[in-house]
Regions:
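Catalytic core segments in nucleotide and nucleic-acid processing enzymes
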Residues: 25
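Phosphate-binding and adjacent anionic-ligand microenvironments
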Residues: 1-10, 14, 20, 28-37, ...
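Intrinsically disordered, low-complexity polyampholyte segments enriched for Lys and acidic residues
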Residues: 42-46
């Protein structure tokens, strides 16, 4: 679609589509709400347990999580794959950054492009009727929750036995800072639980998560389907709030894009990641 901010046509990323669909479902309500027993009054705890939850894989952007936090809605982050997302209780929407969306979890326990396309068409029709478009909605989401810019660096290997070499090296020599910002938290998912969960041996995986003082995040993990190591980068810029004007949002996006994680959207840093100099 045409992006007036960048003055060019471009394809929306999986994270951008996930944020658009997630907000739309928050605004309109779930496609097919969970059937709950309303015959007896519910305690506060029971009501909370039945409240709708939005979810995404751990390697997806944290934008949806922040939006849910702002709106007081439940959110869950899972390991990569819809076999994990489908297990989230009371999920009303779930997605992965690799273009996988579930807008009808009650009936479809997997990603489904047909229902997702229908809901996106519904959103597009509503936006056209209002005289706006998806790019402006992304700016509205940024004003509400902040700018989250994601990128990915990929290292291809010739031998599958090499897949674990990058993560092994990072375990031996973990970075103390990333892009000039101190690392404040490092998680090794072979032994640490996913954020907000308890350790479960069934959910351990070869992945490393680094969070920085600036609020940025780097995740490194071997691909589960291809001979390559993936490095997921995310930079965050706060915005003045829902009253922020378009110029303030554009400034925040430009600041994010100028940083190393944002620049990774446009450049191949495979060589630097192999040697550790990018981190």
């Amino acid at each position: 679609m045409f992006d007036p901010n960048q003055q060019r046509w471009r394809q929306l990323s999986g994270d951008e589509i996930g944020a658009l669909l997630g907000r739309h479902i928050l605004d309109r309500g779930p496609l097919r709400p969970q059937v709950l027993d309303s015959s007896t009054p519910k305690s506060t705890e029971e009501a909370a347990a039945q409240a709708p939850v939005l979810a995404n894989s751990i390697v997806s952007s944290r934008l949806l999580e922040r939006l849910c936090e702002v709106r007081g809605v439940g959110h869950a982050a899972t390991l990569t794959g819809f076999k994990w997302l489908a297990r989230v209780e009371n999920m009303s929407f779930g997605y992965e950054e690799a273009i996988g969306f579930n807008v009808d979890p009650v009936n479809v326990k997997d990603k489904d492009g047909v229902s997702a396309a229908l809901i996106f068409a519904e959103l597009a029709a509503e936006l056209k009727a209002r005289g706006t478009d998806a790019i402006e909605v992304l700016d509205e989401i940024a004003a509400e929750a902040g700018v989250f810019l994601t990128g990915q660096v990929t290292i291809r290997v010739n031998d599958l036995s090499e897949l674990g070499d990058v993560t092994a090296k990072l375990r031996q020599q973990p970075p103390s800072e990333i892009a000039g910002s101190a690392v404040t938290e490092a998680l090794d998912l072979t032994k640490d639980p996913l954020p907000g969960t308890e350790l479960d041996e069934a959910t351990t995986t070869d992945a490393l998560i680094y969070l920085t003082e600036a609020g940025d995040r780097v995740i490194v993990r071997p691909s589960g389907t291809e001979p390559k190591v993936k490095c997921y980068l995310e930079v965050v810029e706060n915005t003045p709030g829902q009253d922020a004007g378009r110029e303030a949002i554009l400034d925040a996006r430009e600041r994010a894009a100028a940083r190393p994680g944002g620049a990774a959207r446009r450049h191949d840093h495979s060589a630097e990641l192999r040697t550790g100099t990018f981190l």
